[in-house]
């Protein structure tokens, strides 16, 4: 019998495969204001959060609440930030979509009213507000997909800070190691065909090849369930992986 493959080890849930969520700063969400009220806060710090690719801003609001919010480009410590229907249209302020002019870039857009923000939260990303209607607002996501949302959904004006992050090369393997460890991702990832036969169903042989069909049943036992799992089609034009 061969050794446990990595998928079986991951299933145990040891610290090697778990995200270090105890280091994450907070779950970011929009502060909810009253229907016609506008809340003002002061940015007191800009911090790094291991949970995400963008920096976060610590804001102290006039009502005494202090919370972390997603930091858009252009904000500075000491500036004020507004939340509400009458907030000024400037980076960092949060308004309902119905109050934001068309063509303005927005980030941390809510999918449902009150969910705190779901779209355009990664560093350097933003959504584009396309059209308004009485019952629906259309936005274009960074992927190019369009979404029809409620006009009451909130969004933050601006582009998420940290743009260009992926353009800087890692250069050293140690830098990549620290990035993956911060996210709880096992790295480096060794291909199955590069392993010995005892370590993986695709291992062994005089050259690197699976040595057997890569398609495998959905009900395959642990240790065999590798390759194209329950694939409808494989090969050219299919959805088969190259592993």
UniProtKB/Swiss-Prot annotation:
Molecular function GO labels: rRNA binding; structural constituent of ribosome
Recite the UniProt keywords alphabetically. Ribonucleoprotein, Ribosomal protein, RNA-binding, rRNA-binding
Locations of Basic residues compositional bias?
1-12
Region listing for Disordered, in residue ranges:
1-38, 198-243
Q: Name one GO biological process term.
A: cytoplasmic translation
The record's listing under Pfam families reads:
Ribosomal_L2 (PF00181), Ribosomal_L2_C (PF03947)
> Cystine bridges: which residues?
none
Bias regions of kind Basic and acidic residues — which residues? 24-34, 221-231
Q: Which InterPro entries does the record cross-reference, listed alphabetically? A: NA-bd_OB-fold, Rib_uL2_dom2, Ribosomal_uL2, Ribosomal_uL2_arc_euk, Ribosomal_uL2_C, Ribosomal_uL2_CS, Ribosomal_uL2_dom3, Ribosomal_uL2_RNA-bd_dom
Instruction: Give yes or no: UniProt keyword Isomerase.
Output: no
Instruction: State the superkingdom.
Output: Archaea
Q: Which GO terms describe its cellular component?
A: cytosolic large ribosomal subunit
Q: Does the keyword Cell division apply?
A: no
Under the heading NCBIfam families, the entry gives: PRK09612.1
| Reported function | One of the primary rRNA binding proteins. Required for association of the 30S and 50S subunits to form the 70S ribosome, for tRNA binding and peptide bond formation. It has been suggested to have peptidyltransferase activity; this is somewhat controversial. Makes several contacts with the 16S rRNA in the 70S ribosome.
Family statement: Belongs to the universal ribosomal protein uL2 family.
Instruction: Kindly state the subunit structure of this protein.
Output: Part of the 50S ribosomal subunit. Forms a bridge to the 30S subunit in the 70S ribosome.
Q: What is this protein called?
A: Large ribosomal subunit protein uL2
Which species does the entry assign this protein to?
A: Haloquadratum walsbyi (strain DSM 16790 / HBSQ001)
